[in-house]
């Protein structure tokens, strides 16, 4: 009986943890990821753009490139505290199907890391893509930075923050797309 009670308590704890970690949009992204056709692109996973564990990106190379060979660099949301590139497979897959090459990146998370670590990671990923464009068979001449929520903040910050003055790829960025991000920010301190 004691063992049964302990097993029930463990199951309750597991269920509570699952409930706390579940986000409704996770279900939607998993569904969309599953339904996206996979025959119009090639995917390379977990490419290391830096030395930190989360300095990884997935690269989706289209099989039907647009004339300008645009590259979308997508940054996930998650309040800088959670989120993962795998939550946004559908972004990479959908845009690759439409003729874009797409890099979907992970970045270091809070609270272990604070601003500007997230933005620095994005700058480092862009640098990696530029330095390895021949090996990766991509063009970085026409980049589009795109992010959701915290990721939208990161893409704006890599171009417009005071720290961005050392960012040498601004001329290659042809568009910035922010999805539900915080856009009014003051870089004080």
Task: Cite the ranges covered by each PLM segment.
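Short N-terminal helix/helix-N-cap motif within the alpha/beta-hydrolase-1
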Residues: 82-89, 112-113, 187
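Short beta-strand element of the alpha/beta-hydrolase
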Residues: 68-77
